[in-house]
UniProtKB/Swiss-Prot annotation:
Family: Belongs to the bacterial ribosomal protein bL20 family.
Keyword list, A-Z: Ribonucleoprotein, Ribosomal protein, RNA-binding, rRNA-binding
Keyword check for Lipid biosynthesis: no
Alphabetized GO MF terms: rRNA binding; structural constituent of ribosome
InterPro entries per the UniProt record, alphabetical: Ribosomal_bL20 (IPR005813), RIBOSOMAL_L20_CS (IPR049946), Ribosomal_protein_bL20_C (IPR035566)
Protein name: Large ribosomal subunit protein bL20
Record flagged with keyword Ribosomal protein: yes
Cited function: Binds directly to 23S ribosomal RNA and is necessary for the in vitro assembly process of the 50S ribosomal subunit. It is not involved in the protein synthesizing functions of that subunit.
GO CC annotation: ribonucleoprotein complex; ribosome
GO biological process: ribosomal large subunit assembly; translation
PANTHER family linked: 39S RIBOSOMAL PROTEIN L20
Signal sequence, renumbered to the chain: none
Length: 117
């Protein structure tokens, strides 16, 4: 049986990691051993922050809705309670967009919530 040397496999593996580490600072983009650790850590951060991004955007939407609601004489919690009672099923993302870009439409939604309280 012929001897199998692993040069091709190792080079492919190293190249894959070093390509993923492109743009990293110093040895992190040049030295395989350091680059591998950097890529693994980057993956961990990416995994964590894909989940944190959802939290951050929801918090941003709530802050924007609250500001818009208070400009129309209602608190965020009262607005959401009113919308639930009125069976208005607009999600926070759309409400935040209305509060920022369509003040008249948002005011109409707030009035509907006020009426149901």
């Amino acid at each position: 049986m012929a001897r199998v040397k692993r040069g091709v496999v190792a080079r492919r593996r190293h190249k894959k990691i070093l390509n993923q580490a492109k743009g990293y600072y110093g040895a992190r983009s040049r030295v395989y051993r350091v680059a591998k650790q950097a890529v693994i850590k980057a993956g961990q951060y990416a995994y964590r922050d894909r989940r944190n991004r959802k939290r951050a955007f929801r918090a941003l939407w709530i802050a924007r809705i609250n500001a818009g609601a208070r400009a129309n004489g209602l608190s965020y919690s009262r607005l959401i309670a009113g919308l639930k009672k009125a069976n208005v099923e607009i999600d926070r993302k759309v409400l935040a967009d209305l509060a920022m870009n369509e003040q008249q439409a948002f005011a109409a939604v707030v009035e509907k919530a006020k009426a149901s309280l």
